[in-house]
Amino acid sequence: MPQSAQAREIVGFAGNYSSGTIVVKTNERALYYVLGNGKALRYPVGVGRASKQWTGTAMINGMQLRPAWSPPAEVKRDKPSLPNVIPGGSPSNPMGAAAMTLSGGEYAIHGTNQPSSIGGFVSYGCIRMFNADVLDLYSRVGWGTTVVVTR
């Protein structure tokens, strides 16, 4: 596990965000779930590689436990041997225990089948979490939750 991948914890958090907002700081490889009163729950995450990072605001528009995964076209181009669908719960499924899809594209906040990738710049733009952490976050959020991705 990269050194930057620390355990989830409650931390001080400054910023003009409403309680319940998710803030991803890619340079920190951290996801913050804003609790309010200057506090947030910080989770270590894996984020997009340098050429795959994005910033902006999205909303959670889908939530699934043990999701099946259909590799996006870009991933299939890079890894043509991948099947068209990997069933949920399969050890080869990179979505892990849960996924929260984001509006505006093919990105999601999801678990992983590669826990050693947490804390790195590793994905095609998705936000990867330890499976225990994604399940914890999943239990705290719902459809329409605001997600802000910054550097």
Regions found by a protein language model. Name each.
Residues V23-K25, Y32-Y33, R128:
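Structural recognition of beta-strand segments within beta-rich domains
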